[in-house]
Amino acid sequence: MTAVIVVLHAEDVALEFVSVLRDHADQDVLVVVGQARASVTLPAGLSLRERLELLGPMVEPGGNTAELPVPSDVAALLGEAPGEIWTHSPADHRIRRARFGWIVSRAVAPFSPSPASSPSSPTVTCSVGDNPFLQTIPGTATAITAAEAEAKIDFINRRAGELLRSRVADRLVTTDRVPAVERFFTVSAVQANRLYALISSLGDDAAVADDPWEFGRSAYEAARLDATAAWTARWCSPQDGPIVEVGACQGELTRRLAGKGYRVQATEPNVGFRARLAERAEPGVEVLPDSLEDLADHGERQAAAYLLVEMLYYDQDLTLLDRLPTDLVLIALETGQLNERVWPWLREQSTWRVAERVELAPPTLESVCDGLAYLRKRGSRGLVLARAGWRR
C-alpha cells in the first residue's frame, strides 16, 4: 500500500518530511495538499530535489484564510486506505496546521467516544512541528544530511521565497521551522482529539475532547481547584447568598463549591462544555449560557461574589466588572496576565480596591495526554476586589 504525506501547504513536505521521503526512496509517495485540495505522486527512484520540484507548482505563498477541508474531503483525496500516513501534529502552535492534523486523524479513523476505541484506533504519524509551549515526546528523531538540508534550502528559496518574509505568522518560514532533526510521534484518533483540544484552549474547539485541561486527572489542577474553593470560602459563606462562577467549563470548581453548600450560578458560553456541566451539575447549581459581557449588560444576577477563575484570557474589557451586581469579585490568573492586563487597569480606576492577593498554585512542569507530552503549568494567583466602600 502507498505511503502518504498529508500536509496543509505544499512547502511543508520540504520543511518537515524530508526524512520520510528518504525512508521511502524506492517507493512511490502520495502527497495530499489540503490548501490546494489536490494530490501528487512523487515517483520512486527520483532524487530528493526532483521529488520536491514536483511540489513547486502547488506552493501558494498567499494568505492563510481559505476554509479547511473536512474529514470527508481528505478521505476522498486519500482514495483507498493508505498503508502509512504522515501529517501535522494536532498540537502544532500554528493552529490551522493543528486543526488540519486533527482533521486527517478523523479522516483516517472517524472519532468514536466509546472507551473500547481508545487503545485500538488506527494511528497516524505526526511531525512534532512548531510549539514553544508544549513538548511532545517523539517516537523517532532523524537527523537530515547536509545534502538534504541543501535540498530543503534550495526548494524554499526558489519556490517559497515569499514565505521568508510573510506577514502571516503561521506561514512565515523561520530558521527553527526548517529543522535539521525531523521528529515524529504516533497518535490514535482519541489522542489526536485530546491534543487538538488542548492547543485550542482559547477557541470553541477546546470542547472537542472531554476535560481537555485534565482538571479531573491532574494533581496540579486538583490542588489549584481545592485552593481556589478554600479561598472563596474565606471571603464569603453559603449564607451570604449565591455566587456566580463565570466560565465554569465542565464544573470541577463548581462541584467543589456545591459540596461546601454554596448556591452556584455557573455560566459557560461554550455549548460543548455547558452540556457536560449541566449533565454533571449537583443540587444547588444553576447552569447558564451567559458570558461576562452578558452578565454585565443584563445586571440581573445579584450575588455575594463573582468568581472569574482562569477565564480572563480572552481580551475581555475589564471595565465590565464595574457593572457586575456584586461588591466582591475574585480573580484568579497566572502572574504574567495579572501583570500585563489586570494591574495596569486597577491602577487607573477607583471603583475597586484590592482586598487580598494570594498564590493559589505555584508553577510546575506536568505531563499531559497520558505522558504523550509535557508543559509548564503557569501557576495561579488570586486577587480579591472589593467595591469601594464595601466592608466585611
Q: Language-model features: where?
A:
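Class I SAM-dependent methyltransferase SAM/SAH-binding core
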Residues: 252, 260-284
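Active-site beta-strand->loop->alpha-helix modules in alpha/beta enzyme cores, enriched
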Residues: 1-120
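The feature marks non-catalytic terminal segments
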Residues: 46, 64, 115, 122-203
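Conserved beta-strand signature within the Rossmann-like core of class I S-adenosyl-L-methionine
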Residues: 327-338
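Class I SAM-dependent methyltransferase Rossmann-like catalytic core
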Residues: 207-223
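Conserved SAM-binding strand-loop segment of SAM-dependent methyltransferases
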Residues: 283-294
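Conserved glycine-rich SAM-binding loop
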Residues: 249
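Conserved alpha-helix/loop element of class I SAM-dependent methyltransferases that forms part
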Residues: 220-238
